[in-house]
Swiss-Prot record:
Gene3D superfamilies: 3.30.470.10, D-amino Acid Aminotransferase, subunit A, domain 2. This is Putative branched-chain-amino-acid aminotransferase. CDD domains: D-AAT_like (cd01558). It comes from Methanocaldococcus jannaschii (strain ATCC 43067 / DSM 2661 / JAL-1 / JCM 10045 / NBRC 100440) (Methanococcus jannaschii). GO terms for molecular function: L-isoleucine-2-oxoglutarate transaminase activity; L-leucine-2-oxoglutarate transaminase activity; L-valine-2-oxoglutarate transaminase activity. Its cofactor is pyridoxal 5'-phosphate. GO terms for biological process: carboxylic acid metabolic process; isoleucine biosynthetic process; L-leucine biosynthetic process; L-valine biosynthetic process. The keyword Iron does not apply. Keywords: Amino-acid biosynthesis, Aminotransferase, Branched-chain amino acid biosynthesis, Pyridoxal phosphate, Transferase. Acts on leucine, isoleucine and valine. Pathway: Amino-acid biosynthesis; L-isoleucine biosynthesis; L-isoleucine from 2-oxobutanoate: step 4/4; Amino-acid biosynthesis; L-leucine biosynthesis; L-leucine from 3-methyl-2-oxobutanoate: step 4/4; Amino-acid biosynthesis; L-valine biosynthesis; L-valine from pyruvate: step 4/4. The lineage of its organism: Archaea, Methanobacteriati, Methanobacteriota, Methanomada group, Methanococci.
Amino acid sequence: MKIYLNGKFVDEKDAKVSVFDHGLLYGDGVFEGIRAYDGVVFMLKEHIDRLYDSAKSLCIDIPLTKEEMIDVVLETLRVNNLRDAYIRLVVTRGVGDLGLDPRKCGKPTIFCIAIPMPPLLGEDGIRAITVSVRRLPVDVLNPAVKSLNYLNSVLAKIQANYAGVDEAFLLDDKGFVVEGTGDNIFIVKNGVLKTPPVYQSILKGITRDVVIKLAKEEGIEVVEEPLTLHDLYTADELFITGTAAEIVPVFEIDGRVINNKQVGEITKKLKEKFKDIRTKWGIKVYDE
């Protein structure tokens, strides 16, 4: 496997970052998880736009243009001869000293990893619980910044692991259900698709936005509003979305069974629509 690291492609064993890099020392950096389907990088421009917005919010000046960064992603796939892949694109503050002062850091560290990952969208559902870990409020760490600091989600995932379930759902400081550890939450109630609004403590997921667009194209009413535990427990359908997850039905939440552990009709329709567009809404890797 070849890794892009600061302008060069190196073997996996040679892809090394300094122990003084602030991405390692302090989680001081940003990233994107991206998918490629059959030689098309899905929603690549949108991922790059979000990466640069996150970096700008943290005062990290990325030394590449957006067009150059797109080329980094495409070339990483080409040198590894990949068509279906998961891509991790990371930009850190760079190498500094052991202090927090970002002015002591040099230029940002940039690396891109691509691993084989076939399309998912199976029919298997997952089990989830709500956990005691609360999602950080917007005035503490804005979720619009997709930073390297995922400790909040890691702690939630640990609780899910101990409970023997697949995923953890986090509440905000007011008790509303907002997110999974790395995914957005949707419910269906009486034919209406509902999801938490972006003004709550959620990442404005790219797959989330795609699902909302697909639903509206299908004539499905979409409402963005705060969701309570009661809303989830009484939902007709429940699913999560994310770059790696795609669209995954949730069959059980806190022991309550959803839709007799069957994929709901709206969930099924959205999964089918997503499968149709995932090789159309993106940038081609290879000239064919």
